[in-house]
Amino acid sequence: MSRLQRYAGESLGPRPHIVVLGSCKVGNFVVSTPVLRGLRHRFPDAVIGFLGSDVTADFEQALPEVDWRASWDATGANAALLLQQFLFERRQRHGEVDLAVNLDGFNPVTCTLVPWLSPRFVAGGSLRSNLRGPLPWGANPRQSFLADSDWDSRSFLDRYDGLFTSNYIAELFCHLAFVSDYVDFRQIMLPSVLPPFEVPDLLIHCTTARAAKIWPFDRWAKVVRTVANWGWRVGLVGSPPSAQKEAYNSGEGEEWLLASTPLQDFRGRTSLIELAGACRKARAVVSVDAGPLHIAAAVGTPTFAVVGNDINGVGASPIRLWLPRVSSCSRSESTYTCDRCSLERFRNDDCLVDGHPCMKGVEPEQIIAWLKSINGLQKDSHL
C-alpha cells in the first residue's frame, strides 16, 4: 500500500503506530490534548508518539496518552540529525507509522517532518513524499476545511453545516483526526505540579505576543488595588522580565504595575507544568488572550479572559475559535465594536485603530464584579 494517503477514518489494524505533531505555542498545545485522549480511546493498543516543542516538553512527558516524545525545535548543531536518528529508532522499535496527525499544519517544519515519518495515512498539513510541494487536502471536509481561510466566523459553520457544532479549535482538531465521537473536545486535562512558592489568591497575566490584545496597565492597577483591599494576595505570572519586554509587549507596563500596586512578581519562576499547579491552587486567574489563560481554564480554576470583543464576539481576539469552552471560564465584553482584526484574519500584531478602543472598552469593573462573584470560594474548593 502506498504511503502518505489522506486519512478518512480507516481502521489502522492491531497495535498501530501513531505520531501526533504539535505546536510550540502553549495555547495550541493545550487544545491539542483532546485529540490525544480521543486517539487513545479509539486505538487503546496504539503506540502514540508526540513530536512537540521544548516549550511544552514537561506537559508532553507527563501525559498518560503519550508513549514517546521528541522536540522538533531542539537547538544545537546536530539537532536535525539527532531527530532523524531518533525517529528512525522509533520506527524500528514500534513499526512503521500508520497515521501522522499534524496539529500544527501550517508550520513548514512539521509539514516537512511528516514525509520523514513515511506514514501510511496523514491528517493535517504535509509535504508530498518528494518534498516538492504540499500534499493536497483531498475532498473529505474533515481534511479540506484546512484550506478555508476563515475559521472564526459564523459563515464558517454555515459552510460546514452538519459537520462542526462550533468554531472551537479543539473540536476542529478532533474532527481532523476522526476522534470526535471518542472524546469530549470541551474537556481539557492537563497535568500539574505545585510551584516552589506559596501561591497567591489571584494570578494575573497581562501580556501577549499580539499587541492588539493588550489591556491598558492602568486598568490592571485598579483591579489589583481593589482585590488587595479585600485581603487577597495577587501575583503576576509570565516569562522572565526580559522576555516579557522582547516578545510579549510588556514595555515598562509590568514594572510600573509592580512598583505602584501590592502585586507580587512570579514571572519566570515556574515551568509550564508548575504554572498549571499554581493556577490550580489559586482562587482565580485573570489573563489576556494568551497561553496562561488556556492553562488556567484547563485545570478547572475560575478563569476570566480579558478580551476586546463585544457581546457578539467581534473584536481583537478570535474567541469563537480559541476561547475555552469550560464552565469555569468567563470573558469580558467590550463596549466598542470593531471588526478590523477579523478582516485581517487576526494577522495584525498591533491595533489598527487609533486609541485601541476595543480593549479600552473593557472596564475594570467587569473583572472586579466577576471576582466578587467568586469571593466566597475557598482557596481549594475547586480542586
List the model feature ranges, each with a label.
Residues M1-L383:
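Catalytic machinery of carbohydrate-active enzymes
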